[in-house]
Amino acid sequence: MANQKKHRWLPYLMVLPAFSIMVLVVVFPIVNTVARSFRTTDGRFTLDNYVYFFTSAEALQSLLFTLAEALTVMALSVVLSFLLALYLRFSKSPVSRALGKLYLLPRFIPGIAAVYAVMNVIKDSGSINRIAAAFGVDYKPGLLYDLKGIILSNLWFCIPFAAMMMSAALSSVNDSYVESARDAGCSWRDVLCRIILPLTYKDVIVSATFILMGQVGAFTIPYLTGPNNPKMLGILLYQRAPT
């Protein structure tokens, strides 16, 4: 009986360190921040912060701008990453093998260095402009300090992350399922909709959720590549937060 009780508590003891760290690093800051949002500087209860946020034109504009950016990045990242993962999983070409080794490379490049590299490509005097000038075309992309610049910069980070998760999910799809469906006369569209998506949709949702959460709270990329107005929500909160 004593051994049974010991084994029953063993799994909980094993996850306790990780759970404690999560509570300390994630849960406590969130609860503390929410609690402080209902207080004034002298500790009294107030709803003024929420009244200001939902009645301020600047705050609402920032919220809508952030949601537009986050949803766009999420949608593009999920679609492009899923297509990339499908290609890496089912193609046997040398190109797919090379991409399978290289697509995670952006994850190992320091974030600031990657952002400045993207900026040097998309700015009006950057690589795109110089390539166009070589063909006698004065082309200014107009991507930097704009919503499009934020989206392009974030895709650099989000696509490898989502593709990694989706590739792991697709690796669990047995080749025999696909081959049997093809032998039965199913098109690739039927295979995708009836076999692959039902087996991988949970990982797709998890990837989309992580990307959306990261974009809503993004700071570095919008700070360096975004417009002065409207601002991403993280930039606005940083500028309005008391020091």
Question: What are these model-predicted stretches?
Answer:
Residues 39, 48-55, 97-100, 104, ...:
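Short amphipathic alpha-helical coupling elements at transmembrane boundaries
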Residues 43-46, 125, 169-179, 188, ...:
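Transmembrane helix boundary and interhelical loop/hinge segments in multi-pass membrane proteins
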Residues 58, 95, 176-177, 188, ...:
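Conserved short cytoplasmic inter-helical helices of the MFS fold
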